[in-house]
Amino acid sequence: MKKTITIFFTFLISILLYPQEKKKIDIKNADFTYINNEKHPDYWRLIGNVNIYHNETNMFCDSAYYFSEKEKIIAFNNIKINKGDSINLLGEKLNYDGEKGIAIISKNVILKNTTSDIESDKLIYDIDKEIIFYNSRSQIVKEKQKISSNKGRFYIKKNEYQFLDSVVLKSKKYSLNTNKLIYNENENINYLQGPSKIYFEDKTIYCEEGYIFNEKSEFFKNSYIENKDFKINADSIFYSDLKKSIKAYGNVFLTDTINNMVLSGNEADFFEKEEKMIFKNRPLLQLISDSDTLFINANKFENFILNNNNLIIAYSNVKFTNNNIIGKCDSLTYYNSDSIITMYEKPIIWLDEYQVFSDTIKINYYDKKINKMYLNSKPMIISKIDTQEYNQIKGEKMTGNFIENKLSIINVSGNGQSIYFLKEKKETIGMNYLESSTINLVFKNKKINNINYEATPHSLTTPIENLKHKDRFLKEFKWRINEKPTINEIINQ
């Protein structure tokens, strides 16, 4: 019994340690076979309709040298290599090493696959591993695209191509340059690895990782889309060529160099046909100026292209600031054709110590500077003097004029009213109430320096000790300092 077990294990070890001998090359056919053991004992000369079989692979040629001791073939003209239904290799010269299972095909080489062809000067076919690779400029030709590269591999089992070094893809809709491209025939997906640029007729896409699948694409790692008008950067970009839409996530920035504008957020949608953009998730609009950039913060922005001009709508909890003002409203529009910013629903602006509000506020932002401000319904200006003391001015309409983004004059028209508290040696001695059809306020060093009236005003001064609490405030008075956002809240969210 022990002897039987010993013999069995000896046999098993011999199988594991010494692999089975490979099958020898089988010469299936040759019109003429020349064997001369004296002149060339190391090879046979095969001529005419040569058919060689090895490793489940058929090789055809016009003529060949067969080195039987080394299990090698050197073949010439009309080379054809077939393995199953998937591989059909054509060329003019073949070097085949039967011991290694390596076939090197050169000169006018074509690999015909089910749906694509590889054209090359030289292909190396590892029959055992079922890999075909090349190290010189070659291209794959499909029905809708061509891909060329300096190096490449084709994994037969996975039906997958790997293109390396100076990869160029050309199709009807776009062209692509990259360092590495993986194309899977079964999935019909192009995977991009390394710096990649995709050129469409109207835009360029860059990424360092991504994929292209039929009409859908996704791009990661320093990705951006650029056209003649703007550039979109994001952590990841999804592009649908069918819908002509873009979805971007993470650190999304739209840079418009024509209009000196940057729109950012963590999520954005772009609709090319509708010429519309939506920014969400902590969006921020920057109207760029060399001297004083305006920052606008909101819950959502929509940007429309109308007659080649931008209309931007900011929705919900809108806040903005530059070096001189802070503003707040529920919604806002900016149309670059007339450079008008319009504030809606409880709009308010803080100018240093002054609070300015109205039902609606319009700001002329020509040349990226605040030039004029229009308050067209129930406008009021308030500045706080003490706990119960506020200087106030109101009217039917107000127009503010700015010089270099700094308020210089405010004109109040229609039923102008004002309340001013009078001081003597820092003590409040009384309050002046005044009515006038027009009031002009002149500012200097960010404070009211002079007040002018175009008609004789009606004025009443009341000593502080006789002043009733209700008379301290004009109608519609509301001190809204608790709503004032900080600059950091606006810019850094």
Predicted segments, located by residue:
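Bacterial Sec-dependent N-terminal signal peptides
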Residues: 1-25
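N-terminal amphipathic/hydrophobic interface segments
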Residues: 20-493
